Every structure is written in C-alpha cells, then in structure tokens.
Amino acid sequence: MAEPRVFLKENRGRIEENYLEQAKNLPRVFAPVDEKLQKCTEEVALACKYLYAFMPYSDIGNYPFEVFLDYAENGVRLWKENPQVADLPEEIFLNYVLFHRVNEEEIAQCRTYFRAEIGSRIQGMNFREAALEVNYWCAEEATYHCTDDRTLSAISVYRRGNGRCGEESVFTVNALRSVGVPARQVYAPKWSHCDDNHAWVEIWCDGKWYFLGACEPEEILNKGWFTNASSRAMMIHSRVFDTKIPEGEVIGTDGMVTMLNELKRYAVTKEITVTVKDAQGLPSEGAEVSFEVLNYSEYAPIAEKKTDSKGTARLTTGLGSLHISARMCSDGEWFYAETVMNTEKEDNCELCLVPQDKRNDGESEKWTAADIFAPHDAPVNTDMPTLEQKAKGNKRLTAANAHREQKVRNWSNPECERFLEKKVNRIEEAIAASYREDLLRVLTEKDRTDCISDVLEEHLELAIPYHGMMKKDTFVSYVLNPRVDDEVLQKYRREIKKHFSRAEKQELRDDPSRIWNLIEKAIVSRPEKERSSVITTPAGCIMTCTGSFLSKKILFVAIARTLGVAARLNPHDRSMEYMENGRFVPVLARTEKNCTLILKAGETVQWKYFQNWSIAKLENGRYTSLKLGAENFEDQILNLPLESGNYRILTSNRLPNGNMFANEYHFEIQPGETKEIELVLREADLEDMLENISMPEFMLKTEDGTEVKASDLTADGKHILMFLEEEKEPTEHILNEMMEQEEAFAGYAEQIIFVVRSKEALETPTLSKALAKLKNIQIYYDDFSEIINTLGRRMYVDPDKLPLIIVTNGTLNGIYATSGYNVGTGDMLLRLM
C-alpha cells in the first residue's frame, strides 16, 4: 500500500529554518503568532510559517495573523482535496498557489471567498480549462480603469469592479490561485515601442508557463491584445519572494525579491555581453550594469547585473536599442560610464569607467544625437482561435460585460456611507460631524472605494482637538488627512499617542524636527528584508521597529499630524516638511540650490515633461530624473533652480513606427552659476516614420449589409482607412483639414475609405459636406465593437480614441496610423499618398 503523502515533505526543513530566523529577528512580533500557530493543524501551521518566512517585513507589520491564515487554510484545503494541486512540484505550489503576495498590492483576505464563488464553475476541469473559465469570471467582475499608483487589494478590485492592468492581474492571479491554478503576474516594465508598460498573467500547466490577459478572456491560452506588443519588448520579467530561486536568468533584485527574465516566451531574443573596464583598461569586477530603455523621455532600467571577474555582464534581451550604464564605487569615489547599443546589429559593447565628477571634463557642451530603435513586430505566439471559438468567446464576453455593468451600476463603498451617517450625541461629536465630508473629500477617488469607516473614525476623533488651531484647509489636508503617501490606510494615532507622555508631546510640538531624531534611533531599515515599493505603515513601523527610509518618512508625518502639527511629504521630492509660521519647512537640511538653469523652448515645439523631455542629475553613479511635473514654460522660458553638479537633458521624438530620435545634452553647473540651454527636438523624415505591419483580415459591410473583405479593399496600391466618429471634434477636425485641401484630396478620393456606424452618420453636417466635396470616397459600415480595438492595438495607436486612421500600401499592409485629435494629419496623409 502506498505511503500517505506528507504535506511539503521536501521543503519542511528549510521552511522551519527560515521561519525561526524571522522570529529571532522580530521576537516581540512573533510571540503572539507562535501562540496562534499552536491552535492550527500541522499542515496549516506549516503553510503559515512559509508565508511568514518569505514575506517582506512590511507585511509582518501591516497585517494581522488572521489575514495570512485565510491564504494558508485555503492552500492546504486545495492540496488535500484536489489531486492536481497535490501533484504539483512543491516549489510551484508554494510560490504560485499558496503564497499571498503577487506584487506590491495591499493584502486582504480573499482566497476562501474567491474559491467559494468560482469553485463550482471549474469542477472536473484541468488547469488549462480552469484558467480560461476563471478569466471569464474575472471579466464578469472587473475591467480596466486608469487609476493612481497605489495598488488595490484583489478583493477591492472585485468589489469596485475595475482597476489598472497591474490591479487586474493581481486580482486574476489571486482568483486562479484560490482554486489551485498556479499563477503569477508578469510585467513588461517599460515598452520599447511606446511610452507605457503592461502587466498580465501566466499560468503553469503541463510542465510549462502559458499567458493570458487579466480580465480579458479568450477561448485559448497564449492569446492577448499584447501578443504583438510583447514581441517588441526588450524585457519581460516575473518575480519570486522565496530565496530558493527557480531556474531562469536572474536580472536583478528589489530587496528580498528576485526578478527573472521571461522574454524568450514572447519575442526573438539574443544574448549580449557588456565589458566594463577601469581607466587603465583593466576589467572591473563587481561593477553594477544597468540596462535601460528610453520611455517617457527618460532612460528607465529594465534589468541590472554585476560584472564577473572578467569585467563582463550578460543579458538575454530583444533586438532593439538599449541604453547601458555602469557604475562602481572605489575608495569612496563613484565612477560611471554609459553608451547606447543596438542589439539587432551588435553582440557586445565595452564601457570605460571615469570619475563621475569628471564626466564632462574636456567635452564641449553640445547636443548629441542618439537613434533609438524599437524591436520589429515579430510575434512568436501565433495561435489563433477558430471562427467557432471566436464567436463563442464574443458571446460570453458580451454576457460578462453586461453582468459587470449591472454589478457596478451606482456602486459606492458602504463604508463611506457608514462614516457619514454616524449619529451625533455629544457636542464634540457635533464638531467632528462637520468635518466628516471634508475628510472623505481630501481622500483620493481610489481611497474612497476601499477605505474603512472604523479607520476614518479614529483619525477624525483624535485629530478634532486641533481643529481650531490653524486654518481649516491646513487642518484638513495636513492634520486630519490619514493619507501621507501610497501606504495602506490604517489606524495609527492612538498607538502613537500612547508612546509619549504629555511633556514629550509638547516638546515635539515645539520642535517637530526632533520627531525624526526619535525615529532614527528607534526604527531600523532592513532593505534586504523588504520590497522597496511596499510601505510599512506607521503602526507597522512601531510594532516591528523596522521600516524603509520612505516608511520612516511617512511615520514622521503620521506622528506630527497625531500631535497636531501640520506636516506632509513634499509632492516634488518626497522630503519631510512641517508647517512653521504659515509655510512648510524641511526637516532635513537640503543641499542648497544655488545655481540657475535657464531653458529656452524655441518657437515650434510644445515641451511636456516626461513626454518629450527630462533632466536628470548624476549622483552615486546613477542619473536620477528631477520631478518637474508642475513646472511650465512662460514666454518660452523655464527657470530652474538647481544644485551644483553634473546633469543630462534628454529630448525625444517618438515616431509612429516606435523608434525614437533622441538628443542628449550633458553639462556641469558650478555653485552660483547661471547657464542657458535651448531645448532641441530632432525632426524626422517621412521614411523614418513608416512601418510595414501585417494587419489581420477583417470584414466591413456595404449599405445593403453585404460583407466585404478588407484584403480586397486594400489590394491595389495605397489606401486610407478612416473610422469616423461623426460630430465629435477630432473627426470634425480631420474632415475640415481635408476640405481645406479639397483639390489635393480629390485626386485620392477613390483610395479613401470612410467607415461609420450607420447611414445616419452620413447626414451630419460636416461629414455630408465632406462627401459632397470629395465625391468618390468609398463608404462602409461597422459597429466598432471589435475591429477598432484589434486594428488600433495592431498598429500601436490608442484604440479608444477616434478617428482611427490607417494608411495601407498593399494588401492589409499598414504603413502608418494615428488616432484621436492630431493637428496636421491632413498634411501627413497627403505626404504619404
């Protein structure tokens, strides 16, 4: 008779060992955890220990034991009841079924609830079938919505019915794990062909990883709108919190998190080699090499490596341009080097480190051009659903959308209503009541969808005594406000107040800078036990006596506000500030900004920070971009007060084919110096802007409903496809541009195809006028439900903005596309034709 299976037999020893290490480091925190573990079954206790052994310290401080118990109990139940789960390799089960954290989201109980909701729908299914079905359930419950950077918990995404892609994928991964399907989030940290990033989901079945779009169900795996986009990525990564690293190429760490290279599943790749040498030409061992892509007009890291004894670092990446920088500290001095490498044509490059303070020595300050090439469109995942599968999927997606829209219609967080409707029985509570709406108003839209009434109640109760000591706006924003940065909103004021005597509180009010001195003595930073983007709450810092530098800064603001001192993190640089004599003053002495940079805009370019230009300072061998979002040019001039040092200005012109024309300006500015620089944007020739993209076949309808293949419409020569949204300004604008150049466009009228939703659109004033002037334009019809999205994504323009205009040259061969409002599109179309 076969021996009974033992839960986590292979990993039991190392789990116990790592758990004991965590408990040894945080004995005060783990004492009550150990007591609760004794009441659990052996399997559940071991599962809990795994979570505690490999979670960031911030999780230990931020959440009670009961939150993690939900994940452990659900994981053990799956292992006991589902043979597929029990048959998983233990490392797959631990990391991708049991583990509670996906990325940097808030953690809340959800797994048991999700399993109860989904379980009956996947009975008898294998992992592949279950993954597809779970994604339909996810689409019924949530969809995409652009929000701020704080990442919601999975249960909050479920409740509010939407989230950005990082939140949709957190939600979907948790849904999959809740029913035993191994799942993880993967990221394109920055695209190379456009200014953005994207996250989606991978599931493990039949011994390998497959992908799917979160809340974007298909009838097959390895299919999503991003399939083509991912083939143009220079990096796609996953992350693992365990110290036992799965097979794969490590491309960096973020504290206790390891990043793994997943690009080979999505794109054509190659291995490149970077050699770093010192000034004498000798190999530099241990140099940090950063691989970066130009995105939002700054060089953004996508992978980091350290050089070996030969001074080399290797990376598997895509076939496009990388900005590669290297840094190293020797005897307290930082050395730096950088270059741009086109990996399509080059296999290796060499960097020679120089002291960063001499970065610009001997160089005349001037603009230097850099051509940045995006990888070509070359998808390696080409599976497509059959026509029957596509029809079935469309029907199911329509039903899912209807279910979700009904669910979220008029939804609001009941906790907000509970907070507003609390009965007022005392005079003090009557005063507080007048501030209830103010407190909710100062929160973000996202905060109002997942805040908890009891948490807000404590902040209101303990802040009200200070309401008459300052202006109302100051009190509401910088004392009453429970939000400091992107931390989890929790109670902390009562916990903070009990740590100080009456005399100590008054001393800290008299000199708020002393709060930071206390924090520095009491709270230690353990970056190797953290994830930099996961914040320890003020209460968590106090409980664990640990926290990152950012977490400690948030704690400073929390303590100050608890004591009635108006405080904040500066919105530009996150520096700690408190109010003194009506203005915010810094807690830590800043480096004096005793230099002035005068930037001249020129006449023709509209400069937008982090869109077509940025400026970065070189410190500690790394360029860090300045945060200038609120700064604007006035009369073509922008005055920037700067610290002395070495800087780099980047300008970038993104072309329709995804490539970029970049300009770099390196300069040094001395104390007291004023320097003038005129920003220069490189212009593109027509041939630089074109692409050859094979579009999928699609059907349009004639006036009588006859279907016509797009391949037939685009077969001979060049054509202009225009999907129009009548009587909306962007469509009206291009129609007016065409009529202003009536004679020129009339020569191409037979090659222009207008696509509208209905015959009534043709009767609207501007469109009917355009058709009267350009008599031979072809008219076709579509409901815009699917084709717009497919073509927009395929041509790498925003499918949510109309009109969608595509120029073709030959059968289904797109050479240019634009969407939305763009001045000068008419001129561009004439140039292309």
Positions of PLM-derived features:
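Secondary-structure boundary elements
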Residues: 3-160, 390, 395-544, 554
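Short active-site neighborhood of thiol/selenol oxidoreductases, capturing the structured segment around
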Residues: 710-735, 751-754
